[in-house]
Amino acid sequence: MKLSDIKKVYGSGSLEVPVLHGINLQIEEGEFIAIMGPSGSGKSTLMNIIGFLDYPSAGTYQLNGKKVNSIKENQLAELRNKHVGFVFQQFFLLPRQNAWKNVESPLIYAAIPRRERMNRAKEMLAKVGLEDRVNHLPNELSGGQKQRVCIARALVNNPEVILADEPTGALDSKTSEQIMELLVQLNKEGKTVIIVTHEEEIAAYASRVITLKDGMITDDRRRAHEHMGEL
């Protein structure tokens, strides 16, 4: 992924609100990146552009050498479904569907057979420690459990890239550690992991930390994983 002079402006005319100011960023396959910065710095907007949820107002976004910032919405949706798993700060769970049906939802669009969808969804729920909650509705789950369902949903389509906006925000410290270790393991397996966080202890799991302020990158540093031993 390569972002060149990416700008994002919301509104128009006298109501224009610039959010990103000329972002230049190259992301290599298999990186583990944390994006940090104060509220309003543009972190989530940048993540939305990286994850094909939003178009930049100006600049060039390349994926594997191909420009993607000017492709049609249906092609953008296909890229999202095939390449990216999302974990949002809000849960976005279907209130009338149980945990495994929420987790399987990305697979429906990929035309995966029902039995395989169910098996993969339950496998992912077990991976995040919810094997005993597969039939529970969202209103029967705690906030932390809901967030883990979201993480399982992000993993179920076996994406190349995992984008997580405050992935541990609703979790206690022990569960946060388990979730981050899971993301570390997925990164070891070759997945690119990009998280937005305001917590230094969560960013410490990443090997590269990018800091935004007022829509600009003010720091981009690489470091050894503090929680990953030899990696």
Give the label of every model feature segment.
Residues 1-212:
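ABC family nucleotide-binding domain
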